[in-house]
Amino acid sequence: GWMHDLERMTITDLRQWHDRWYSPGNATLVIVGDVEPDNVKTLVKRHFGNIPARPVPEARLPLELNEPGERRSTQYLKTRLPMLMLGFNVPALNTSDNVTEIHALRLISALLGGGESARLPARLERQQELVAGASSWFNPFARGDSLFMLSATPNIQKGITLDQVEQALWQQLQALQETPPDAAELERVRAQLIASEVYARDSITRQARSIGMLETVGLSWRLLDSDFDSLNAVTPADIQAAARRFFTPQRSTTMHVLPEEARP
């Protein structure tokens, strides 16, 4: 949130918010592990059964305009280095009419920024020496619409500017629009993404969080069982189609982040 919103809030505002939303009807209790169901039910009733139920307001999905038009901003923040952030309005699993596109965006994020062998670090950082670091991220499990984000820090030792970094990021996106990844690159990225999910499921805590997160945003925990099949179904053509649909100026927000000392 924004600091000016927090500064305007009162204790009464916070209590009303808490009373409105923090109730059993708006909670998800997840228990994972080697437990006896009957014993768990007894413990749940003992520790949570006395909490009174309250009506819960209908929660609306936070939807965004598909193509709000190109937006640009410059922010002067407490940071040592400049940064370029480029975001695109995209749907999530909750709001998409084509879930294959969402899984394609997941793989695009991994293809661009998923590790040292990904395109942004390999091409922009090591080959072209334009950036000191670059990353991408996308949350497919948002309660409403989501953002596909790219960020990069220019190589100031080489005198690279934010405008040059911005142009380089767009070139990487346009490369996906013009030419789909070859099968070998897609399989490598897919294997890395699935492997990271498999390792994460070794953690009981991570399992509980994943189940709770899906149910809380309105998706089924059973998506975990079909997730790998969904990723495996994505083709190079799906990657190209998603890049063409979503990575457009009309969906984009560009932010130049500069140190406060650079303010004119």
Residue ranges of model-derived segments:
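Short, solvent-exposed loop/turn segments at the edges of secondary structure
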Residues: 22-25, 67-70, 78-83, 102-103, ...
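Low-complexity, intrinsically disordered Gly/Pro/Thr-rich segments
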Residues: 237-244
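M16 family metallopeptidases and their MPP-like homologs
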Residues: 1-4, 26-32, 82-95, 122-233, ...
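Phosphate-proximal small/polar/acidic motifs at interfaces that engage nucleotide phosphates
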Residues: 62, 121-122
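An aromatic/glycine/proline-enriched structural segment found at the starts
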Residues: 28-94, 201, 256-264
